[in-house]
Design a protein with these regions (language model features):
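N-terminal glycine-rich "phosphate-gripper" loop used for MgATP/nucleotide binding
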Residues: 16-20
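ATP/NTP phosphate-donor binding region
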Residues: 1-14, 24, 60-63
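Short, active-site-adjacent cap segments at secondary-structure transitions
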Residues: 22-23, 47
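Catalytic core of DAGKc-family lipid kinases
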Residues: 31-36, 40-120
């Protein structure tokens, strides 16, 4: 909602500072607009930023953003909700849900969630 409001007020660039969840929320608000999304990664995985080769160090990310390169990207939808990097179903979706509920972050926590479910 904040990203949509920013565009309605005339913003042509909206910056997301956070992880994949934050980036997804901000990017969702920019669909069908001419506004650009700037990403400064600060999450535990930063999958989309890594895919786009945006450095995970904030100062390095800002240097990349200052180059002003804008590129279009595709997105998908599931049940009306957009996604920009990954989408999972079945066991993968279950693990993602448990990971989100755990409050822990990082690749070890993700593996731990999967192993706990597998061993039950």
């Amino acid at each position: 909602e904040l990203a949509k409001e920013a565009v309605e007020r005339g913003a042509d660039i909206v910056c997301s500072i956070g992880g994949d969840g934050t980036v997804n929320e901000v990017a969702s608000g920019l669909i069908h607009t001419n506004a650009a999304l700037a990403i400064i990664p600060s999450g535990s995985g930063n999958g989309l930023a890594r895919h786009l080769r945006i450095p995970t160090d904030p100062l390095s990310a800002i240097k990349v953003l200052n180059r002003g390169l804008v590129q279009s990207m595709d997105y998908g939808t599931v049940n009306g909700r957009p996604f920009f990097c990954t989408c999972g179903v079945g066991f993968d979706a279950f693990i993602s849900q448990k990971f989100a509920e755990s409050g822990k972050r990082g690749p070890v926590s993700n593996m731990e969630s999967g192993l706990n479910k597998s061993l039950r």
